[in-house]
Amino acid sequence: MLCATVSGPSFCEAKQQILKSLHLVDIIELRLDLINELDDQELHTLITTAQNPILTFRQHKEMSTALWIQKLYSLAKLEPKWMDIDVSLPKTALQTIRKSHPKIKLILSYHTDKNEDLDAIYNEMLATPAEIYKIVLSPENSSEALNYIKKARLLPKPSTVLCMGTHGLPSRVLSPLISNAMNYAAGISAPQVAPGQPKLEELLSYNYSKLSEKSHIYGLIGDPVDRSISHLSHNFLLSKLSLNATYIKFPVTIGEVVTFFSAIRDLPFSGLSVTMPLKTAIFDHVDALDASAQLCESINTLVFRNQKILGYNTDGEGVAKLLKQKNISVNNKHIAIVGAGGAAKAIAATLAMQGANLHIFNRTLSSAAALATCCKGKAYPLGSLENFKTIDIIINCLPPEVTFPWRFPPIVMDINTKPHPSPYLERAQKHGSLIIHGYEMFIEQALLQFALWFPDFLTPESCDSFRNYVKNFMAKV
């Protein structure tokens, strides 16, 4: 069941949160410990409006256990259908509630801000009878979150395993895959009641209504991933295609690569987008490389097929496709590539095959030289770009925070989606350059990824819808 958490804090706010959320969820949770003191009539109104909600009252730090118990006793006398009670409540008090009010369904909850042993917690909780056992954990990285999800799928039902904090979102989105008895999101206009708890509208945007125990997982890995809009755009397309799948951003550092790939092997991943700094760091975890990835020695797309992980790169072809759409030929053109990372490698390799004369500018000259050798180009220190004479097209592949000498040839492209518009492109446009935004490349390389992931479902109409969604979204940024 999907549950909207309502926490006011005022009576009027709580009532509005219920009314706005009720039609989107299966049940409402009233966090009465967070709602301002209610009189009997107000409490009755909220319970009636919420239609058999879960009543929850957590113990405040300054509240004595005796007062907490009395509060729970008074709520139990209302004979709610559900009560959520923390496992720290003295057993005698819990037994009193169960004996006096046998019709109340109990959710026994355990919350921790640490990384703990899920199986041990669950087995200990089984000693206390309950209708649902809810365990909320705090993973320290994406791998730990995925390992919790794997273990949660094996627990006897009904149970609920969720994660808090920066890395907790996958457990919320994948709750149907886990077969959680209950999943929680902050109700419409309601504050979040736990670190990392998603808002209801955010959770639903992950194609949540289509998800089940048989869902496929797609996502983005890298560090950072917060600049990407892919969780919005890609889930829009998945929803439009009515696929039983979702797309989630997973922050993964280079040091976490080994544990991450160990975790995903036993989960229904079907595809991953790869961003920096992992494009060249994951080769040992791929079973086979497509020519597109071999050519540039960089991976931006993983396809999971027949128990194998296949590596591709759509960055270069995405740029080539975009330039062709704009009737821009690169044959015999002098193109400055700024940067020598994974995306720069893919773009340079593809444009070299189309006859471009490539000039690689980078902070580390050895990296520029290595790339120049691969694409039969020339390498230069980043600072020398300022006085370089012959440029027809410049493509910036450096992160937004890295400064470099701005040049304004006839065509200027910045592959960064954010910030939008980039200060560099704004200045280039004022100088009369034709500018190409990062989101335009993002669109084309993403569509090539989709063609690898689910070719049987992609249509020209859905591709156009995706393009329009991204363009309209970026216009509002």
From Swiss-Prot:
Q: What is its EC number?
A: 4.2.1.10, 1.1.1.25
Q: Which Gene3D superfamilies match?
A: Aldolase class I, Leucine Dehydrogenase, chain A, domain 1, NAD(P)-binding Rossmann-like Domain
Q: Does the keyword Oxidoreductase apply?
A: yes
Supply the InterPro entries for this chain: Aldolase_TIM, Aminoacid_DH-like_N_sf, DHquinase_I, NAD(P)-bd_dom_sf, Shikimate_DH, Shikimate_DH-bd_N, Shikimate_DH_fam, Shikm_DH/Glu-tRNA_Rdtase
Active site, per annotation? H111, K134, K279
> At which positions is 3-dehydroquinate bound?
S21, E29, L30, R31, T56, F57, R58, R172, Q197
The pathway it acts in is: Metabolic intermediate biosynthesis; chorismate biosynthesis; chorismate from D-erythrose 4-phosphate and phosphoenolpyruvate: step 3/7; Metabolic intermediate biosynthesis; chorismate biosynthesis; chorismate from D-erythrose 4-phosphate and phosphoenolpyruvate: step 4/7
Q: What is this protein called?
A: Shikimate biosynthesis protein AroDE
Q: What does this protein do?
A: Bifunctional enzyme that catalyzes two sequential steps of the aromatic amino acids biosynthetic pathway. In the first reaction, the AroD domain catalyzes the cis-dehydration of 3-dehydroquinate (DHQ) and introduces the first double bond of the aromatic ring to yield 3-dehydroshikimate; in the second reaction, the AroE domain catalyzes the reversible NADPH linked reduction of 3-dehydroshikimate (DHSA) to yield shikimate (SA).
Enumerate the residue ranges of region (3-dehydroquinate dehydratase). Answer: 1-209
Which GO BP terms, alphabetically?
amino acid biosynthetic process; aromatic amino acid family biosynthetic process; chorismate biosynthetic process; shikimate metabolic process
Q: Where does shikimate bind?
A: S228, I229, S230, N300, D315, Q445
- Catalysed reactions, as listed in the record: 3-dehydroquinate = 3-dehydroshikimate + H2O; shikimate + NADP(+) = 3-dehydroshikimate + NADPH + H(+)
Q: Which residues bind NADP(+)?
A: G339, A340, G341, G342, A343, N362, R363, T364, G438
What family classification does the UniProt entry report for this protein? Answer: In the N-terminal section; belongs to the type-I 3-dehydroquinase family. In the C-terminal section; belongs to the shikimate dehydrogenase family.
In alphabetical order, the GO MF annotations are: 3-dehydroquinate dehydratase activity; NADP binding; shikimate 3-dehydrogenase (NADP+) activity
Q: What keywords are assigned to this protein?
A: Amino-acid biosynthesis, Aromatic amino acid biosynthesis, Lyase, Multifunctional enzyme, NADP, Oxidoreductase, Schiff base
